[in-house]
Amino acid sequence: MPRVKRGVQARARHKKVLKQAKGYYGARSRVYRVAFQAVTKAGQYAYRARRTKKRQFRQLWIARINAASRQNGLSYSRFINGLKKASIEIDRKILADIAVFDKAAFAVLVEKAKTAL
């Protein structure tokens, strides 16, 4: 069986990992073994964070809608229920945006939700 030399592939793999670890502190950006562990862990954190980001933004939108609807005399759950009964289909992201940047329009939505209840 002939001898297989894998120096080129190993060098390329090491360079790839070290390039991904650029900007890390100390040995994490210079030593392949440590950099590989750091890059692997960073990938796990990134995978997890892509999922938690969705939950966190939804929580933020709900908190903003709740605060704005309470200023207009209605709780969040009753406000959402009123919108559903009034057949107004605006998602929470847009509702939160309206609540922050256009308080008059949000007040109109709250009034429509109140009349539908």
From Swiss-Prot:
GO MF terms held by the record: rRNA binding; structural constituent of ribosome
One GO BP: ribosomal large subunit assembly
Keyword terms, alphabetized: Ribonucleoprotein, Ribosomal protein, RNA-binding, rRNA-binding
The keyword Membrane is assigned to this record: no
Domain of life: Bacteria
One GO location term (cellular component): ribosome
Annotated PANTHER family: 39S RIBOSOMAL PROTEIN L20
Family: Belongs to the bacterial ribosomal protein bL20 family.
Function according to Swiss-Prot or TrEMBL: Binds directly to 23S ribosomal RNA and is necessary for the in vitro assembly process of the 50S ribosomal subunit. It is not involved in the protein synthesizing functions of that subunit.
Protein name in the entry: Large ribosomal subunit protein bL20
Originating species: Vibrio anguillarum (Listonella anguillarum)
